[in-house]
Amino acid sequence: MKKKKTWKRFLHFSSAALAAGLIFTSAAPAEAAFWGASNELLHDPTMIKEGSSWYALGTGLTEERGLRVLKSSDAKNWTVQKSIFTTPLSWWSNYVPNYGQNQWAPDIQYYNGKYWLYYSVSSFGSNTSAIGLASSTSISSGGWKDEGLVIRSTSSNNYNAIDPELTFDKDGNPWLAFGSFWSGIKLTKLDKSTMKPTGSLYSIAARPNNGGALEAPTLTYQNGYYYLMVSFDKCCDGVNSTYKIAYGRSKSITGPYLDKSGKSMLEGGGTILDSGNDQWKGPGGQDIVNGNILVRHAYDANDNGIPKLLINDLNWSSGWPSY
């Protein structure tokens, strides 16, 4: 919602940082919970591995067109790749006349022989938004095919079609979660061929008493439960950000999702996983990778509040996520 307007303003000072590389303490630690933190800007991250290379994608910077893309062969030395969607697609303005030059909060997954990339275009401060889809058989070779509109929202809707998350149920069926503020997080089943909605729209999380401040859903299935993580409160304000990661779980992908105290996430429930610390402020925009890795951004209080990528292994041994 309004977070993106603030984020755009926040990034005006960032162009000098674009040449820096991401540095992690380990490429793929088997047991160490914390992989490391980046020295580069990345916001609303999603991460995937193709062959021997890691790719991290995020919201585009104000100084760039398209989605930001980073690549590493060892998760220690990262290079900035050509952005995706450097040329705007013509249909975006049909649904979002006032969209910016960058796109927001991508999610990438591999399914049925293709990489599926969901992303958002929106107008600042409103729910005039659209989620789009692109596909490719290879990240490294590019060649992204525009798959068009997935779902949209307007002022007549009670939800906001941004922050997409492709997930799968225990039987391997694809679903899409999305949402930001308004009436909260939505979930819909996808057609396996088109990867677009084919069923009902379910509500799975909301914050009716907190100004609706939640967004950025990510889901995974572990040990008989579906786990939903969301971001609470305010992002995109540097060290003054109050973003935090909250979670709940359900036996059914469509809910109800309950936190550790038993409160429904539709009633504002959510157990806090990460609210930051003295250095890392406002962690959120999270994505669960392969079921056991969590990526998110946080604002570095030791570096002018610049948002950086943090990566942790997730531990599920207690029946709840931890790191």
From Swiss-Prot:
Protein name (database record): Extracellular endo-alpha-(1->5)-L-arabinanase 1
Sites marked Important for catalytic activity, responsible for pKa modulation of the active site Glu and correct orientation of both the proton donor and substrate: 163
Residues at which Ca(2+) binds: 107, 165, 287
Listed GO MF terms: arabinan endo-1,5-alpha-L-arabinosidase activity; metal ion binding
Known cofactor(s): Ca(2+)
UniProt KW Transcription keyword: no
Phenotype upon changing residue 215 to A: Loss of arabinanase activity
The record's free-text note on cofactor binding: Binds 1 Ca(2+) ion per subunit.
Pfam families linked: Glyco_hydro_43
Superkingdom of this protein's organism: Bacteria
Biological processes annotated in GO: arabinan catabolic process
Enzyme Commission number, as recorded: 3.2.1.99
Residues where substrate binds: 44, 125, 160-163, 180-182
Result of altering residue 181 to A: Significantly less active than the wild-type arabinanase against both linear arabinan (50-fold) and the arabinooligosaccharides (1000-fold)
Similarity-based family: Belongs to the glycosyl hydrolase 43 family.
Subcellular location field: Secreted
Stated induction or repression of this protein's expression: Induced by arabinose and arabina,n and repressed by glucose.
Organism: Bacillus subtilis (strain 168)
InterPro entries: GH43_arabinanases, Glyco_hydro_43, Glyco_hydro_43_endo_a_Ara-ase, Glyco_hydro_beta-prop_sf
